[in-house]
């Protein structure tokens, strides 16, 4: 089986970049890091797992919120160090409550001109404090 090239080293951990994309619309939902163990769990379960560089641990997307990502297809780039997971997103992908983490549009001078997406859930109702 071909595996990603986990060439990015952060906090001593070998990682690759993972992009979650809506399998129907092509909308980019989020970008995260993934290590070999999280990649293997993702392939085995067909549910997205990532590696948190701030918590130094694997996390199952939706473990706390229930907003999981069901894997439909996996793509590797030419260097095999970036992965696209084409997913069926259940609920929102972003911890802010938005469907996608990419909901801010910037003007030419870099100012946020709009948040063009309504929230699909209230984070205060989902995440423990």
Curated annotation (Swiss-Prot):
GO terms for cellular component: cytoplasm. Pathway: Amino-acid biosynthesis; L-histidine biosynthesis; L-histidine from 5-phospho-alpha-D-ribose 1-diphosphate: step 3/9. Its EC number is 3.5.4.19. GO terms for molecular function: magnesium ion binding; phosphoribosyl-AMP cyclohydrolase activity; zinc ion binding. It is an enzyme of class 3 (hydrolase). Keywords: Amino-acid biosynthesis, Cytoplasm, Histidine biosynthesis, Hydrolase, Magnesium, Metal-binding, Zinc. Its main location: cytoplasm. Mg(2+) binds at residues 77, 79, 81. GO terms for biological process: L-histidine biosynthetic process. It catalyses: 1-(5-phospho-beta-D-ribosyl)-5'-AMP + H2O = 1-(5-phospho-beta-D-ribosyl)-5-[(5-phospho-beta-D-ribosylamino)methylideneamino]imidazole-4-carboxamide. It is found in: Cytoplasm. Its cofactor is Mg(2+); Zn(2+). Binds 1 Mg(2+) ion per subunit. InterPro entries: PRA-CH, PRib_AMP_CycHydrolase_dom, PRib_AMP_CycHydrolase_sf. Zn(2+) binds at residues 78, 94, 101. NCBIfam families: PRK00051.1 (NF000768). HAMAP family: HisI (MF_01021). Catalyzes the hydrolysis of the adenine ring of phosphoribosyl-AMP. Homodimer. Belongs to the PRA-CH family. This is Phosphoribosyl-AMP cyclohydrolase. It comes from Methanosphaera stadtmanae (strain ATCC 43021 / DSM 3091 / JCM 11832 / MCB-3). The gene is hisI.
